[in-house]
Every structure is written in structure tokens, then in C-alpha cells.
Design a protein with these regions (language model features):
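Nucleotide phosphate-binding/pyrophosphate-handling subdomain across enzymes
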Residues: 137, 142-145, 154-165, 169-171, ...
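N-terminal leader/targeting and accessory segments in enzymes
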Residues: 1-58, 62-77, 87, 197-199
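C-terminal helical cap/extension that packs against the catalytic core
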Residues: 204-223, 289-291, 331-389
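A glycine-rich beta-strand to alpha-helix segment
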Residues: 377-407
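Internal gly/pro-rich beta-alpha loop/helix module
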Residues: 162, 176-191, 195-254, 260
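Short internal beta-strands
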Residues: 81, 197-202, 318-321, 341-349
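Extended acidic/charged loop-beta regions that coordinate divalent cations
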Residues: 84, 130-176, 205-235
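ATP-dependent carboxylate-amine ligase catalytic core
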Residues: 22-32, 36-48, 73-159
Length: 417
């Protein structure tokens, strides 16, 4: 095992991780004290460069990648912090669209393993510090920093950004962020800083007063993005990406770093190539069509299903779906197309909803179901049965499993249709 693999495995297996275990006192802390202590140990690397801070129920990851791509096209060295990762924890802290060297990660963990243990950091706290340190060591000109969950208490909420961005507000993580959209908006608006401009991508009557109140209290100018805002074409598939692009364009306009229009256009047209984004309406195969998407809550799932129904048309269609155990699945189950055959699977994380329970829920919803042990098995079986369009999702962890299966050659490339 390489030094990098040892370091990566230690971080993933040893440290409390929300994505794997769900919310516990060890994975979701109700203050930023540990994060601040950790950053002090590291020499406060987050203070070494300007940044843009992005929160939101959905769209924040794509918007971060768009911003990184735009600023890269403008000639800046850009650090990009996002989560969760799909295949490699270094996806959480890219520089110029590239992963940090494996040796850097191994050296960092060896140097700070005792600090991480002594502070009893969660995986997210540890990797946020890693990201900020990586960006300092790489001498970035700008960092794009995605919030992990919420905003007010998120470990990233130690930065003083050029702009604060809130892409959207939906019902997700309600046990931590509040029972309604107004409460969730208040938590996410916790990233608003004094005099720092704020860009919001969703602002209906339920949540706009929250943004107005907190922006006013911070003397921050509020910029509300609508479908009337200008938009340029992006290479990212997914109908929802147009609004993310509008948010990115508005953010560039208020952040204060000069960027030319042709650089914005080029950045939006090369997001995946410039930043390595995967898992957002990601076409894994064309014949048959296999598309993976990370939509995992009703706010993201409903538009994803509208697009799925449109692109599959009259094709014989299947869906490879798996979920985590701590989500409200009511809306998801109600909106799965009844004419699709469902290949139920279990994401390879401890938080996964166990397969027999998931299959039972699908059958109770009146769906045609096949039970499969893994995403790879499900995709292979759907292809073997001749389905012409296959959707992979329900959870970002199912998407990650599918990407890993394709990478490792576990999906048959033979076209059975």
C-alpha cells in the first residue's frame, strides 16, 4: 500500500464522517471552536488568499465548479474546495482543476496525524484544514469554497470572502438545519459577512425576508438572481445548470476581480474539462444511454425526473437507485416514473438504507423492482435485459459507486440491446 493510500484510508476509516455515518455529535459539531484551533495549528492558511464562499441546498457544487472554470480562464490559479468526493479525497481540494500530488497528502497526514487525533477532528474538519493548507502551499490567487452543510456552523464559515453565495433553499438535513425553508435559509444565511455582497439564486416570499433581514444587519448588498438574468451556454448537462450559470455570472460581477465576457463564456463552456466535475447529469455511456445524477432530495429530484422523462422519450427505461437511511423518501417514491423498471441497490456506505427495506418501499409504491447487491451489478443487469436508457442515482454515493465500477472495469461494455 502506498503512503498516499495509507493516509487516505486512515482519514476515511478512522475519522467520524457525516457522509458515511450520518449526523452524530462527532460528525456535526455545533460550533466552530475545533475548526479554529485546527486552523491555528496550520498557521491560519485560509487568510493567505481571497475566496468566494458558496452555500445552498442544491447547485452549490456545480456553481463552484463554474466559478473556478471562469477564473481559470481569466488566468488565475484557483483553489476549489467541494464535498463529498466521488473517487478520491483529493477531489475536495483541486488547484487549477488538478488534484494535489499524492505525496503532498501523505506528507500532510504524517505531519499532522497527532494534531488531528488530539483535537478529535471529524473527517470534514480535517479535510477543510487540508484544503486551506493545500491552497496556501500552491500559492493560489483565489479559492472557491463550498459549504459542506448549512452555513452558520459549517467548518468553512471561518473565511472572509469577496462574495457570499446562496444558490437555493430546499428541505434537506432538516434535523440539523430546521423544519422549514425559512429556518434553513437562516442557517445558510449564516455565511453572510459584514459589507460582503450576497448573491442568492432563489428568493421567493418564504425566504426572501430572511435574506433581506440578515443582509441589512450586515450592511451587505443583496443581489437576487432570476431567470431574467443573462446566461451563457455551459458544457454541463442538466436543465438546472442554466440557473447555476446565472448565479455564477452574477457572482463574478460583484466579487470585484476583473473578468472579461469572453473569459466568462469560455469558462462556462469548459467546466468539466477545466475542473474535473463528475456526477451531475453525467453521461457514462451513449448506447445504451447511461446517465448518472447526484440529485438526492425533493428540491433536486423533481427537476431531474422532469428531464429524465424528456430525454428517455419512448425508450425502454430502467433506473438504478439506492438511498441513505436518514432521508425523507416520500416525494422521491411518489415521483419515480411508474413505467421504469427499478434496479434497487445499496450504496457502499454505513448510512445506506438496507437493500431489503429499500426494495420493500419501492414495491409498496407500486413499482417494478429488481434487487441487486451493488450499483455495478444493477447496471450490468439492466444492460443485459436490453434497456435503452438507464438512470443511476438516488444518492451521490450510488453515483460514486457507479463511477468506481466504470473506472475499475466492473461494468460490461457489451451492448445487449
Amino acid at each position: 500500500m502506498s503512503r498516499f493510500d495509507e493516509a487516505s484510508n486512515w482519514l476515511v476509516q478512522r475519522l467520524p464522517m457525516f457522509q458515511r455515518q450520518g449526523g452524530t455529535p462527532a460528525t456535526y459539531r455545533m460550533d466552530l471552536d475545533k475548526t479554529r484551533q485546527w486552523l491555528q495549528v496550520l498557521g491560519n492558511p485560509h487568510q493567505a488568499y481571497p475566496c468566494i464562499h458558496v452555500a445552498g441546498t442544491n447547485g452549490k457544487g456545480s456553481t463552484c465548479h463554474m466559478l473556478a472554470s471562469i477564473y481559470q480562464e481569466a488566468g488565475l490559479v484557483v483553489g476549489l474546495h467541494t464535498s463529498p468526493h466521488m473517487l478520491d479525497l483529493r477531489e475536495r481540494f483541486r488547484v487549477g482543476g488538478r488534484l494535489m500530488p499524492e505525496a503532498w497528502v501523505a506528507d500532510f497526514v504524517e505531519a499532522h496525524r497527532r494534531d488531528i487525533e488530539d483535537l478529535e477532528l471529524s473527517f470534514f474538519e480535517a479535510t477543510v484544514g487540508m484544503a486551506f493548507a493545500a491552497f496556501r502551499d500552491a500559492r493560489v490567487d483565489l479559492a472557491i469554497v463550498e459549504v459542506g452543510m448549512g452555513g452558520r456552523l459549517d467548518s468553512t464559515n471561518v473565511v472572509m470572502p469577496l462574495a457570499s453565495v446562496i444558490t437555493s433553499i430546499g428541505l434537506d438535513h432538516t434535523a440539523f438545519l430546521g423544519p422549514d425553508r425559512s429556518s434553513i435559509a437562516r442557517e445558510k444565511a449564516g455565511i453572510i459577512k459584514p459589507t460582503v455582497p450576497v448573491v442568492v439564486g432563489e428568493w421567493d416570499a418564504e425566504i426572501l425576508p430572511v435574506f433581506q433581514e440578515i443582509a441589512l444587519a450586515n450592511n451587505s448588498q443583496l443581489h437576487c438572481v432570476s431567470s431574467q438574468n443573462r446566461v451563457f451556454l455551459t458544457d454541463l448537462q442538466g436543465d438546472y445548470q442554466a440557473q447555476n450559470a446565472r448565479v455564477a455570472i452574477q457572482t463574478v460581477a460583484v466579487a470585484g476581480i476583473p473578468v472579461l465576457e469572453h473569459q466568462i463564456r469560455r469558462g462556462l463552456s469548459k467546466v468539466a474539462a477545466n475542473t474535473g466535475l463528475r456526477g451531475r447529469w453525467d453521461v457514462l455511456e451513449k448506447r445504451p444511454l447511461v446517465v448518472a445524477d447526484s440529485a438526492h432530495n425533493s428540491h433536486g429530484w423533481i427537476p431531474a425526473m422532469l428531464q429524465w422523462n424528456r430525454i428517455r422519450g419512448s425508450k425502454r427505461a430502467a433506473m438504478v437507485l439506492g438511498v441513505v437511511s436518514d432521508k425523507d423518501l416520500t416525494e422521491l417514491l411518489q415521483t419515480i416514473p411508474k413505467d421504469c423498471v427499478i434496479f434497487g441497490c445499496e450504496p457502499s456506505i454505513p448510512r445506506a438504507l438496507e437493500l431489503t427495506a429499500w426494495v420493500a418501499l419501492l414495491r409498496d409504491a407500486g413499482l417494478q423492482v429488481r434487487a441487486c447487491l451493488s450499483a455495478a451489478e444493477a447496471i450490468n443487469q439492466a444492460k443485459a435485459e436490453g434497456f435503452q436508457a438507464i438512470y443511476v442515482g438516488g444518492s451521490s454515493f450510488v453515483v460514486a459507486d457507479a463511477l468506481a465500477a466504470y473506472r475499475d472495469g466492473l461494468v460490461s461494455k457489451r451492448n445487449h440491446s
